[in-house]
Amino acid sequence: ISNYFKKGLTEIFYEGDSYNFTYTKEGDFIIKKNTDALSIYPLPQIMYVPAERNFISIVNNPSLIKELPDSLLTFLSEYDKAKSIIKGDFILPINEASLEYSKSNDTISVKGNDYKVKLQEASSGFQSIVPLYLVSRYLSDSVSEQAKHSHKMSNDEAKRFEEEVSRIWSDNNFTDTQRRIALSALSAKFNKSAFINIVEEPEQNLFPKSQSLLMQSLLLFNNKLDANKLIITTHS
C-alpha cells in the first residue's frame, strides 16, 4: 500500500481505543499508547478473508505453493484448522447444502438432495462461501470458548506483553513475514476475548438470496460477543 503514498503529501491517522497510529508526511510511523491501554483492551483474534479465497477451493495442496500473499497464507492456515469442525453432515446456510470432509485425502465435498461433488468441481458460489463460512464459524466458536476463560492482564503481564511486542516490532533482523509470525505466536499465549472478522466482498459469486443468508450467518457469529467486530468491503 506504501506505493500509493506520496512523500510530503500523504498522512494517515488511526485513533483506536488503546493505541493511536500516525503515518506522517515525512514517512515516519508513530505508535502512541492511550492510558491503561491493555487494562481495557479485549485481545482479539483478527481474520482477514481475502477475495482470492476461491483459489484455496480449486487448487490441490495450496499450502505447497510458494510466494502466496501473506493474507492468503494466514487465511489458508486457519482454513486447514477449520476443516476439523466438518463432522457428519455440516450444514451450509445456502441451497440446503452440506459439506462432507474426507481426512484421508483432504477433500471437501458439497452435498445436496440429489448430488455430491468435490468443492474443486462445485460452482464458484460454493468455492467462495465455503472457505469464508468455515473459517468464520470456526474462529467465532473458538474465541467464544476462549472468552469464557479469559481474564484481564495483570500489570506485570501487560508490561511483559508490551515489551515483547516492542522488541519484535523494532528488531530489524526480522522480515515482515517473520515479524507477523512472531507476533502471532506471542498473542497465542493469551486467551482471545474478541473476534474481528474482516471480509472482502462477502457477496462474491452469490445470488442475492444467498448473499442475504450468508450475511445473516456472519452477523450471528459477530453477535456472540459484545467485543466482536465485523468489517466488510463490498461492491453491492
Indicate where each model-derived feature is located.
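Conserved D-loop-proximal element of ABC-family nucleotide-binding domains
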Residues: 207-208
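Conserved hydrophobic alpha-helix in the ABC-type ATPase nucleotide-binding domain
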Residues: 213-218
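Phosphate-coordinating catalytic segments in nucleotide- and nucleic-acid-processing enzymes
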Residues: 1-196
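Conserved ATPase "switch" residues in P-loop NTPase domains
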Residues: 222-223
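Walker B catalytic acidic pair
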Residues: 200-202
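Loop/turn-to-beta-strand initiation segments
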Residues: 193-195, 226-231
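H-loop/switch region of ABC-family ATPase nucleotide-binding domains
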Residues: 233-235
